[in-house]
Structure formats: structure tokens, C-alpha cells
């Protein structure tokens, strides 16, 4: 508990100084002092893995589709379509394919969280001024070199803001995954709904999940603001 807690506070200090360190540490401290710390870590581990894969998927797909106007409109329409689905619908196909396992929950979380990651990648890359595209092309760089040196660094702050949505989507799906059996906070939350007097426990654990989201949000927003200052982006 102690090592993980100080590791999180250290990340806050490195990214945003003492202010971010205290905010993140204060949010996580509430969870660390409870008896549900181990379950919270399982939730965080599952969400971290899902967010990492979703971010990679979103960056790859978004970068390919942001190249022209037609593919941009198509992928954004697809994102709109999948975001209108009730979140638990994503569990149905993975249960049919992989059965009732934690793997099914992870796959559903990755699929669900890839939507905002893709959307924000497309929007971030499309927001890069066309004059910079032209300058890169005139200097003789390839499309890949232009993406690495110009487009992606400038779009990264916007992409990182989309990571907030990716984290929220992943946590939401993982908590819902308790419907088919997981050992994280979601299992206790779902179980509290059917127990007399369990509403308080369910509400408390819901707050714990929101604290995880708020801690990640603080780290991402702090880093993004600093990055925007370095790039001179308003």
C-alpha cells in the first residue's frame, strides 16, 4: 500500500509539482485507508491495460483516417455510431466469443474505450495548421517523418485530453464487467445492490472509482497545460 501510494504521489510531483502531488495523493489516500485497496488496485490495473491498448488503437486508426476529409468524416461517423450504444451491449459479442471470463471484460473495455481515443486523435491531427503541413512537404520530408516531427507533437496535447475520456470509458466498462464476473470494485458494487443496507457501500465504492478518474484527470490536464505552454498553444 505504502509503496504504491508514494509512487502515485511521486508521479504527481514530477508532472505538476507539489500542488498536483497533494491533490493526487489526497484522492488516493481515501482509497488507501479503506479495506478495498486491493480491489481498487485490480480495477486500476485492468483499466491501465485497457487504456494503453485503446490509446494505441486510437492513435493508429486516427492517424490513418486523419489524412483526408472523406476518411475523417467516415471515422467520426463510426465513432458517433458506437458511442450511442448502451455500454453493456459491448459485453454480448465478447461473451459469445470468449465466454464469461475477465478476458471478455478486458476486450469489451478496449473496444469501448478505443472510440474516444480515435476521435480525439483525428480531431487533434486535423487541428494542425495546413501551413505546417506545407512547410514539412516543401522541406522534403516523408509523410512518416512529417507525422513524427510536426503533426503528432502538435496534436499530442489534444490527444492526451482525449485520454481522460478513454480512462472514463474503460473504468465504466470494467465496473459493468461485474455483471459477468470480475474481482474488482465492480463486483462489490453490484453485490451491494442486492444486499440490505448495501447502498452505502455501493455509493462509497462509486466515489472511489470517481477518485481514480479525478486523479488521472489531474495528472493528464497538468501535463497537457505544461505541454501547451511549451508549444505556445492557447
Regions found by a protein language model. Give the residues of each.
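Transmembrane alpha-helices
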Residues: 51, 107-111, 143-176, 200-216, ...
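Membrane-spanning helices that line or support transport/gating and their immediate boundary helices
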Residues: 39-43, 63, 73, 77, ...
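Alpha-helical membrane-interface segments at transmembrane helix boundaries
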Residues: 37-45, 49, 72-75, 79-82, ...
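Generic hydrophobic transmembrane alpha-helix motif, especially the helices
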Residues: 31, 46-49, 53-60, 66, ...
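Transmembrane-helix boundary motif in ABC transporter permease subunits
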Residues: 8-18, 24-38, 49-79
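Short cytoplasmic-facing helical segments at TM-TM junctions of multi-pass membrane proteins
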Residues: 117-160, 189
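Glycine-rich helix-loop "coupling/hinge" segments at transmembrane-helix boundaries
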Residues: 96, 125, 170-209, 228-234
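Hydrophobic, membrane-inserted alpha-helices
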Residues: 2-11, 24-29, 89-93, 153
Amino acid at each position: 500500500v505504502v509503496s504504491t501510494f508514494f509512487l502515485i504521489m511521486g508521479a504527481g510531483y514530477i508532472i505538476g509539482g507539489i500542488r498536483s502531488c497533494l491533490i493526487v495523493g489526497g484522492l488516493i489516500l481515501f482509497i488507501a485507508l479503506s479495506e478495498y485497496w486491493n480491489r481498487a488496485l485490480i480495477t486500476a490495473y485492468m483499466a491501465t491495460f485497457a487504456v494503453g491498448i485503446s490509446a494505441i488503437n486510437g492513435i493508429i486508426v486516427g492517424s490513418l483516417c486523419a489524412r483526408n476529409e472523406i476518411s475523417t468524416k467516415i471515422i467520426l461517423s463510426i465513432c458517433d455510431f458506437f458511442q450511442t450504444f448502451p455500454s453493456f451491449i459491448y459485453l454480448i459479442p465478447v461473451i459469445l466469443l470468449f465466454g464469461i471470463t475477465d478476458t471478455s471484460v478486458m476486450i469489451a473495455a478496449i473496444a469501448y474505450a478505443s472510440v474516444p481515443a480515435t476521435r480525439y486523435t483525428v480531431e487533434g491531427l486535423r487541428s494542425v495548421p495546413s501551413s505546417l503541413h506545407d512547410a514539412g512537404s516543401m522541406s522534403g520530408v516523408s509523410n512518416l517523418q512529417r507525422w513524427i516531427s510536426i503533426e503528432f507533437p502538435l496534436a499530442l496535447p489534444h490527444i492526451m485530453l482525449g485520454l481522460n475520456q478513454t480512462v472514463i470509458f474503460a473504468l465504466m466498462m470494467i465496473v459493468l464487467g461485474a455483471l459477468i464476473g470480475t474481482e474488482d470494485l465492480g463486483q462489490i458494487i453490484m453485490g451491494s445492490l442486492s444486499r440490505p443496507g448495501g447502498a452505502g457501500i455501493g455509493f462509497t465504492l462509486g466515489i472511489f472509482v470517481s477518485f481514480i478518474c479525478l486523479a488521472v484527470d489531474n495528472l493528464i490536464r497538468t501535463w497537457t497545460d505544461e505541454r501547451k505552454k511549451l508549444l505556445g498553444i492557447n
